[in-house]
Amino acid sequence: MTVSKKVEENIFASKLGPEYVGFDHITWYVGNAKQAASYYVTRMGFKQIAYRGPETGSRSVVSHVISNGQAIFVLTSPIRSMAGTGAYDDDPDVTKADRRLLEEIHNHLIKHGDGVKDVAFRIEGDIEAVWKRAVDHGAAPVAAPTTLKDDRHGSITLATIGTYEDTVHSLINRHDYSGPFLPGYEVVTDDDPINRLLPSIDFIEIDHCVGNQPWNGVDPIVKYYEDCLNFHRYWTVDDLNMCGEYSAMRSIVVASPNEVIKMPMNEPAQGKKKSQIEEFVNYYNGAGVQHIAFRTHDIVTAVTRLRERGVSFLEVPSAYYSDLRQRLSHTGLTLEEDIAVLEKLHILVDFDEKGYLLQIFSKHVLDRPTVFIEVIQRNNFDGFGAGNFKSLFEAFEREQARRGNL
């Protein structure tokens, strides 16, 4: 176990620009949306809020929309294959737009497996102005601004731009829309009976969403966010502090002008063996979303209940908590939580003179060692747990070694 020392991390000042509201939703492309949605309902207490499929007029693609607090996942799958050249050219049920979407989803699944396609941002201001600035500065214009309406809930404006690899950002203004998700989706009010039998999980929102890049990929994508979306460098720490015994990485966090959206970007750094970032890029076949962090007011209760629901987390050696007790004894900071309970649950702690952060990382939620989930509680602390990186890397390295990928 490597004893953590005080890590030098840099947090930068914010910029003006109030239009960003937060993360709107995360869209996944998966092989079986119904089963994928059921996993998050069963394991993490999500509830289905909307649905799109053949019953709603979507003849080729199905989407299950689930939420926990303000965190929204959209699990999307094709329900038709793309076998054969010119598939569905003569099928009146499959439009040209359907064929394009089917091809996009199938290609994504072939290349990446199940994974995140769209990290959508909610914006209160002018979608067209944000989209135009992004496109003028080099962002791929995936979908121009458009307004969708339904008679019951009003109208919604959205547009989409490309970001790293095959990932995109939808830009959404919900000011004039009262529905649970988007026009064209059927509202779902019936909760899964499993949620009446299992303890509830209370997430507040998506705290951050992390993108893994290949070697030397961070600086170009950070410049993209600065130029295209007027984001700025919010936080950074070097590879000397983000390492384990065998591997290392480099990370920069970019944030929206008003800092309500934060996007850490990671890349591999030189080490003795393959890093977790390299493993991700190899199995995902490129850059992509590595993990999504859910913020909660009470991580002890949340993690206790997640474990009861069957979620598996990375394990932290007891030496970490001996070191934590020693470091805390030299400060004036007192944790509200019992360290013995944190140790039992394998929850990590980082702190400074102003406050502290509690965090824990799940094991991968897919068979491919790509995407996982973080649960985080912030107590007057805006960093990203730099003091825990060495311990985290060692935990990841143990899992990599079990898979034969270290």
From Swiss-Prot:
<keyword id="KW-0828">Tyrosine catabolism</keyword>
<protein>
    <recommendedName>
        <fullName>Probable 4-hydroxyphenylpyruvate dioxygenase 2</fullName>
        <ecNumber>1.13.11.27</ecNumber>
    </recommendedName>
</protein>
<feature type="binding site">
    <location>
        <position position="208"/>
    </location>
    <ligand>
        <name>Fe cation</name>
    </ligand>
</feature>
<dbReference type="InterPro" id="IPR041735">
    <property type="entry name" value="4OHPhenylPyrv_dOase_C"/>
</dbReference>
<dbReference type="GO" id="GO:0046872">
    <property type="term" value="F:metal ion binding"/>
</dbReference>
<dbReference type="GO" id="GO:0006559">
    <property type="term" value="P:L-phenylalanine catabolic process"/>
</dbReference>
<dbReference type="InterPro" id="IPR005956">
    <property type="entry name" value="4OHPhenylPyrv_dOase"/>
</dbReference>
<feature type="binding site">
    <location>
        <position position="291"/>
    </location>
    <ligand>
        <name>Fe cation</name>
    </ligand>
</feature>
<comment type="pathway">
    <text>Amino-acid degradation; L-phenylalanine degradation; acetoacetate and fumarate from L-phenylalanine: step 3/6.</text>
</comment>
<feature type="domain" description="VOC 2">
    <location>
        <begin position="205"/>
        <end position="363"/>
    </location>
</feature>
<dbReference type="InterPro" id="IPR041736">
    <property type="entry name" value="4OHPhenylPyrv_dOase_N"/>
</dbReference>
<keyword id="KW-0408">Iron</keyword>
<dbReference type="InterPro" id="IPR004360">
    <property type="entry name" value="Glyas_Fos-R_dOase_dom"/>
</dbReference>
<keyword id="KW-0585">Phenylalanine catabolism</keyword>
<dbReference type="GO" id="GO:0006572">
    <property type="term" value="P:tyrosine catabolic process"/>
</dbReference>
<keyword id="KW-0560">Oxidoreductase</keyword>
<dbReference type="Pfam" id="PF00903">
    <property type="entry name" value="Glyoxalase"/>
</dbReference>
<keyword id="KW-0677">Repeat</keyword>
<keyword id="KW-0479">Metal-binding</keyword>
<dbReference type="InterPro" id="IPR037523">
    <property type="entry name" value="VOC"/>
</dbReference>
<dbReference type="GO" id="GO:0003868">
    <property type="term" value="F:4-hydroxyphenylpyruvate dioxygenase activity"/>
</dbReference>
<feature type="domain" description="VOC 1">
    <location>
        <begin position="22"/>
        <end position="174"/>
    </location>
</feature>
<comment type="similarity">
    <text>Belongs to the 4HPPD family.</text>
</comment>
<feature type="binding site">
    <location>
        <position position="374"/>
    </location>
    <ligand>
        <name>Fe cation</name>
    </ligand>
</feature>
<keyword id="KW-0223">Dioxygenase</keyword>
<dbReference type="InterPro" id="IPR029068">
    <property type="entry name" value="Glyas_Bleomycin-R_OHBP_Dase"/>
</dbReference>
